[in-house]
Structure formats: structure tokens, C-alpha cells
């Protein structure tokens, strides 16, 4: 009986050591492979910002081609809100191409289409005389929201977003149900997210602060070379 117990303890001890070694190996691998970490479903602020920063050159290039170079941080803030930089459709722009959600499988296409859609909303918004918050909100609610705000003073508010959402829900109540969850914060305004513009602005501020720190670190590094 004692021999059996010793055998069980030995097996358990070996298993614990094996698990510890494997776990340690994975931790070391992750520590030295930042690209691998960014692909994992880990959403710490630092990792999310690293994902977004990877898209910065492409975002800058696409915005420059549209004459909107000043909006890099905003687009990255929108990406932060849409997907945290994860997946093949980081700008969640599939639907603006007439596709189903997440049907875009090329992240670069997602970014290009997302910026194309933002540019369209931006130009439409400027023509209609609405504020930037309305343009941001329209990325979530569509161009119809720009028309709606233009008819109600030209300045976005969450109350106007709720009113517009309510209108759209009445047109198709079986579709916009918040997943049937009455406890969803959007309920009963289940078309879009009436808080979208505010969330994007908060995340844009976070992105701007991160980019400023990165710029200062780069400058200091060059100064010490």
C-alpha cells in the first residue's frame, strides 16, 4: 500500500514539474515574441495599443490619399472601439461593402474600406454642416444620422442618437432587439450604439497619449545615439 502511495506521489510530482516547465517555456516564448502575444485574445491596454500602432503606417497612408492626414489618432480610436485591433476586420467595415459582419478576411482591406467609409461620412457631414461628433457617430449609425442631425440643429448629442435609433427600431422592430436582452444598456434604442461617439473620443485620447509617449521615447533614443 505504501509503495502505491509513493508511486502516486511520484507521478503527481512529475506531472507538476512537467506542467511548470511547459508553462515557463510558454511564458518565455511570449515574452520574446510580441507578435505572438498580439494575436492572442489578451486585451490589456498596452497590448491593444501595440496592435493599433502596427496599423498606423497604413492608416496614415490611406488618410493622406483622402486628404485627411489629421485624423490618424481618430481612426485608430475608432479601430480601438470596433475591434481593439484584433481579427481580420479591425475596422468592422464588412457591412459598408454590402457583406455580412466580419466577412472581410484581409485586415488591410478592412482598414482601407473603413477609411473610405469614414471619408464618405466626413464629406457628407461637411456638406450638411454637422459637427465632427455627428460624423463619428455616423460611422456606427450610417449616413442617415447625418441627415437627422442636420435637421435638428447640426450638433450631435446622445439624446439625438437615441431618437434616431428609436426611429430605425420602429421601422424594423424584429431586427433591432438588442439580442432580446432588456438589460442591454442600449435597450430600447437597439439600432447602433448611441454612446459610440463618446467612446471613440475617449479611446482617441488614449491613442494620442500613447503616440506622444512613443514619439518622445524615439527622440530620446536618437539623442543618445
Curated annotation (Swiss-Prot):
Q: What is its main location?
A: membrane
TM stretches of this protein: 12-32
Q: Which UniProt keywords apply?
A: Cell membrane, Membrane, Transmembrane, Transmembrane helix
Give me the gene this protein comes from.
yocA
- InterPro entries, alphabetized: CwlT-like_lysozyme, Lysozyme-like_dom_sf
Q: Which GO terms describe its cellular component?
A: plasma membrane
Family matches, as Pfam families: Lysozyme_like
Superkingdom of this entry's organism?
Answer: Bacteria
Kindly give the Gene3D superfamilies that the UniProt entry links to this protein. 1.10.530.10
What name is this protein filed under? Uncharacterized membrane protein YocA
Q: Which SUPFAM superfamilies match?
A: Lysozyme-like
What are the subcellular locations of this protein? Answer: Cell membrane
GO BP annotations, alphabetical order: carbohydrate catabolic process
Query: Where does the record locate the signal sequence feature?
Result: none
In what way does this protein cross or attach to the membrane? Single-pass membrane protein
Amino acid at each position: 500500500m505504501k509503495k502505491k502511495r509513493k508511486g502516486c506521489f511520484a507521478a503527481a510530482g512529475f506531472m507538476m514539474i512537467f506542467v511548470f516547465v511547459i508553462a515557463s517555456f510558454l511564458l518565455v516564448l511570449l515574452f520574446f515574441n510580441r507578435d505572438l502575444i498580439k494575436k492572442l485574445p489578451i486585451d490589456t491596454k498596452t497590448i491593444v495599443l501595440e496592435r493599433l500602432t502596427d496599423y498606423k503606417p497604413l492608416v496614415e497612408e490611406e488618410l493622406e490619399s483622402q486628404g485627411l492626414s489629421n485624423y490618424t489618432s481618430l481612426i485608430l480610436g475608432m479601430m480601438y472601439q470596433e475591434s481593439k485591433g484584433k481579427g481580420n476586420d479591425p475596422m468592422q467595415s464588412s457591412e459598408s461593402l454590402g457583406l455580412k459582419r466580419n466577412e472581410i478576411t484581409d485586415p488591410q482591406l478592412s482598414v482601407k474600406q473603413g477609411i473610405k467609409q469614414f471619408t464618405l461620412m466626413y464629406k457628407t457631414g461637411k456638406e450638411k454642416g454637422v459637427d465632427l461628433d455627428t460624423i463619428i457617430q455616423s460611422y456606427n449609425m450610417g449616413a442617415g444620422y447625418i441627415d437627422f442631425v442636420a435637421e435638428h440643429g447640426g450638433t450631435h448629442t446622445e439624446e439625438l442618437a437615441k431618437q434616431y435609433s428609436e426611429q430605425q427600431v420602429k421601422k424594423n422592430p424584429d431586427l433591432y432587439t438588442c439580442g432580446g436582452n432588456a438589460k442591454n444598456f442600449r435597450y430600447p434604442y437597439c439600432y447602433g450604439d448611441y454612446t459610440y461617439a463618446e467612446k471613440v473620443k475617449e479611446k482617441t485620447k488614449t491613442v494620442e497619449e500613447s503616440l506622444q509617449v512613443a514619439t518622445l521615447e524615439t527622440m530620446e533614443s536618437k539623442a543618445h545615439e
